């Protein structure tokens, strides 16, 4: 414990005083845990849990004594019997089972007349629902028959459960809401504390994710342990991964001494005090520019592409996973001692990188997520995240919710249920739901069978019109949703009318969003022929055969591959150039050699002036002789 802080504690708190692993004794002793009810009103909690547990155990013992009584009477249904056989038969009835379930849930016991009336009412509602939804598929009907054959009492049990749940919703809602009193019930990621060093309308907040299941029940005890001498070497792990970027660190709970450090532009003194025992960052090219998302996600969504860029991204994804797991293996001695392991991963595949190894287990309670948003994984971002986690925050005291919201919540839900019961769905709306479901699943044979069975044509108007005003027909809906295969089948096989327009005057062709759907319309036009309809009114482009569409797609793919290859070449050249510059910078400019005279020049310099003149005359004479020989 920092004794200097304890002696200098004043009424105003500074950011540096709020580090949860280095709190002053005065501040630590002043923290008072706050508890709230369901309306976010502060409640003073009294320690009566032991008395309540003793009372509950006594009630259980009394209940057991009643059950094991030799009197021929049902203590649940409040009925007496003349013989033991009658009593045994009663225990096997649905009436007794209903009252047992209601008794366990704290509801009133029903009489025989009330039970018969409720069951009859529920049977009536069920039969009406079945009649209104009569357009049931044959497979669903067979499944329901098989279920009833397997368990003849299943339907009655479902009725009883429905009745009990309705009664619980009506009678137990307000009680459940008012009884939810806890320091965890803050409707936020924080736990709140009061302190005499704060203003009346202020509280100190700490993230719940810093606690495990045991310490969360007693946060004051956990804070005391964190600040004691028993916990001097505590560490935590921080990992972030996303977009091909990775950053990881092992952080000590003991801060560095930054007294006298200079202020940096991108890093505060508090961030400079973060003590990273180990840290590692690296990046690999795994996401396509301006597209986002990993290559594996794109493969799952649109199929596996065969371009050079996609192959490079797949390789880098695998390499990134190997690199991260290598870091985890190297840091295994640290990870085994960590109190917390915070991981930020954008998707399930990134999260599996950390758990698909022998270092970390998926069920490890130390593994947690950051309870706030983070930026690109870097060392500086890890420091910011640790500062956000490890410092108490001075926040305004939570405002209680309006009482009317809680009181009227059940009334509003009941009114909505009543409105839904009164507003019975039309047959056309039920048929529309089935058609939309088959379209989404791509079940063309079942869709054709459904239309024939219900005597519907391909131009069936989807209901309600307010919901499907922009997509009034199946063809409009398939075009807007990008269902290329279903659009082709609707035109070629079901013979939907492509000239129908929505309320904005747009045909199904006008709603398409990609080339695949456009090509499906053009293939259908080619298959149906020009005599099928007035194609000018449909706005569909020129007819194309499947071979022509395949040729267009191949050209498009070749252009994309060429662009990707050029991009990769440019990146490789840039990397080589960068590497060459780095080597040149490392080697330095070097020393230039002075001009060295030739051997002939060295020989001339060694002669005297007379010898040099004589040599020059001889050379000129030889040259003249050579010229004369060539001339004659």
Curated annotation (Swiss-Prot):
Specify the residue ranges making up the C2H2-type zinc fingers.
Answer: 72-96
Q: Where are the catalytic residues?
A: 295
Query: For bias kind Basic and acidic residues, which ranges apply?
Result: 578-589, 609-632
**Where does the record place a coiled coil?**
544-582, 608-632
Any idea where this protein resides?
Cytoplasm; Mitochondrion; Endoplasmic reticulum membrane
Q: What is known of its domains?
A: The VLRF1 domain mediates binding to the 60S ribosomal subunit.
State the protein's name: tRNA endonuclease VMS1
């Amino acid at each position: 414990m920092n004794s200097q802080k304890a002696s200098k504690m004043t009424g105003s708190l500074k950011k540096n005083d709020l580090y949860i692993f280095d709190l002053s004794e005065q501040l630590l002793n002043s923290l008072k845990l706050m508890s709230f009810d369901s309306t976010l009103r502060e409640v003073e909690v009294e320690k009566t849990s032991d008395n309540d547990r003793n009372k509950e155990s006594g009630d259980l013992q009394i209940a057991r004594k009643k059950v094991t009584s030799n009197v021929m009477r049902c203590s649940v249904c409040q009925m007496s019997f003349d013989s033991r056989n009658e009593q045994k038969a009663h225990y096997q009835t649905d009436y007794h089972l209903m009252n047992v379930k209601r008794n366990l849930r704290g509801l009133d016991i029903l009489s025989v007349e009330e039970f018969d009336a409720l069951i009859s009412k529920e049977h009536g509602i069920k039969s009406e629902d079945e009649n209104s939804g009569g357009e049931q598929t044959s497979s669903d009907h067979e499944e329901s028959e098989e279920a009833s054959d397997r368990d003849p009492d299943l339907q009655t049990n479902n009725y009883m459960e429905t009745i009990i749940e309705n009664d619980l919703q009506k009678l137990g809602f307000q009680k459940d809401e008012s009884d939810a009193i806890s320091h965890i019930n803050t409707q936020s990621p924080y736990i709140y504390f009061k302190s005499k060093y704060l203003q009346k309308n202020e509280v100190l907040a700490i993230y719940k994710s810093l606690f495990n299941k045991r310490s969360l029940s007693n946060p004051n005890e956990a804070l005391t342990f964190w600040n004691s001498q028993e916990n001097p070497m505590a560490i935590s792990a921080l990992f972030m991964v996303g977009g091909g970027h990775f950053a990881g660190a092992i952080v000590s709970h003991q801060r560095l001494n930054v007294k006298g450090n200079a202020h940096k532009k991108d890093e505060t003194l508090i961030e400079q005090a973060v003590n990273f025992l180990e840290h590692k960052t690296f990046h690999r090219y795994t996401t396509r520019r301006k597209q986002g998302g990993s290559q594996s996600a794109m493969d799952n969504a649109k199929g596996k592409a065969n371009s050079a860029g996609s192959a490079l991204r797949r390789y880098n994804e695998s390499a990134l996973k190997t690199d991260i797991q290598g870091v985890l293996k190297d840091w295994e001695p640290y990870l085994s001692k960590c109190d917390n392991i915070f991981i930020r991963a954008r998707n399930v595949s990134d999260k599996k990188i950390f758990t698909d190894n022998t270092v970390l287990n998926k069920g490890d309670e130390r593994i947690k997520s950051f309870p706030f948003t983070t930026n690109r994984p870097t060392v500086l971002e890890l420091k910011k995240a640790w500062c956000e986690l490890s410092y108490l925050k001075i926040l305004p005291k939570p405002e209680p919710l309006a009482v009317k919201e809680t009181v009227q919540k059940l009334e509003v839900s009941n009114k909505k249920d009543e409105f839904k019961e009164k507003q019975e769905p039309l047959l056309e709306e039920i048929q529309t739901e089935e058609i939309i479901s088959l379209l989404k699943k791509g079940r063309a044979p079942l869709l054709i069978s459904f239309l024939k069975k219900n005597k519907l044509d391909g131009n069936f108007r989807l209901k309600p019109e307010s919901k499907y005003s922009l997509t009034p027909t199946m063809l409009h809906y398939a075009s807007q949703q990008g269902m290329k295969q279903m659009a082709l089948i609707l035109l070629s096989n079901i013979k939907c009318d492509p000239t129908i327009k929505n309320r904005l005057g747009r045909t199904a062709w006008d709603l398409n969003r990609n080339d695949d759907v456009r090509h499906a319309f053009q293939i259908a036009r080619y298959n149906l022929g020009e005599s099928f309809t007035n194609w000018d009114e449909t706005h569909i482009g020129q007819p194309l055969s499947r071979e022509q569409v395949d040729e267009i797609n191949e050209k498009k793919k070749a252009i994309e591959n060429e662009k990707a290859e050029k991009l990769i070449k440019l990146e490789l050249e840039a990397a080589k150039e960068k590497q060459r510059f780095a080597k040149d910078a490392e080697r330095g400019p070097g020393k230039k050699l002075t001009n060295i005279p030739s051997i002939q020049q060295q020989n001339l310099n060694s002669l005297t002036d007379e010898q040099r003149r004589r040599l020059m005359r001889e050379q000129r004479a030889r040259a003249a002789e050579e010229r004369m020989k060539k001339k004659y």
